Amino acid sequence: MKSTPLNLYAEGNFELLNKEIIAIVGSRNCSEYGWKQAKKFSTALSQNGICIISGLAIGIDSISHISAMNNAGKTIAVLGAGFNNIYPKENKELFNKILENNGCVISEYPPEEKVNTKNFPRRNEIISALAFGVLVVEAGYRSGSTITANLAFKQGKKVFAIPSNIDSKLGIGTNSLIQKGAKLVTNVKDILREINMNKCKDIEQEWKYESKNVPIKYKNVYEIIGNMPIDINTICRRAELPIQDVSEQLTMLELNEYIRALPGDMFVKVWIN
C-alpha cells in the first residue's frame, strides 16, 4: 500500500483476517450474467472454506456477501465511511446481517466519518491488501473494480477475471485486465489451484429462465428483456406500448421474480437454478 493505515476500525469477527481471503469486486449496475457469476463463485469459494471480502456496494459486492452467508461461509466488508454512515443506505440491513453471521466489517475511518467519494480508492486498496487475490466479475473500463485490480497488481497479489461479452460495456474493464495479465477463470478450481487447494467442491449449476410460467398478457414485454440490462424506453418502443402499460407489466413481472430492476430504470431477466 502507498501508506499503512494509522487506524483500522473493526466490528465483528476480526479473526477472519487470518483465513484465506479472496476479494470479489465488480459493477454496481451488473448484468444478469454478472449476477450469476458472482453468486456462483462466491458460493463455491465459501463452500471450500474461503472467506469473501468486498466493499458492501450494491451489485456484485452485495451478491458476493450474501452468497457467502447463504452457504455457511464468512464474509468481510470494507467501508469507505464510518460505521455510523453506512453507504449505500439500503445496505444497512446487509451490514447488520454480516455481523449477525459472525462476519467482520472494517473501516479506516472513525464511526462518525461521512461518505466521501475520495475515500473509495483507499477502501479498494485495503480490500486488495487484505486478500490473497482479487476476482473481478464484471467491470467497466475506468471503474472502481479495475482500480482495485490494478492496485492488486502493484501489491503483488493474484488478479483473476471472468471474461465478458466483447460487445458489453459492462465487461470492457474485465477483458482489458485479462489482456494485462489477469488470470482468466471459468470455474472455482482455477482460483483454488493458485491457493494450492487441488481438492475442491465445485458448484456446477444449470441456469434457465422461468418463461413457461409467465402469464400470457406479460409475455410480450418479458420476451423483450434479456440477460443484459435494457431501459424502459427501449422496452416501450419495442413493445409498441405506452410507458404506463409497460410500467405496470414490469412491476408485476418483478413482484413475481421473473425480472429484476436495476438502477436507472434498467431491467434484466432473473435466472433460476
Model-derived features: positions:
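Glycine-biased, small-residue-rich flexible motifs in mid-sequence functional cores and linkers
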Residues: M1-N273
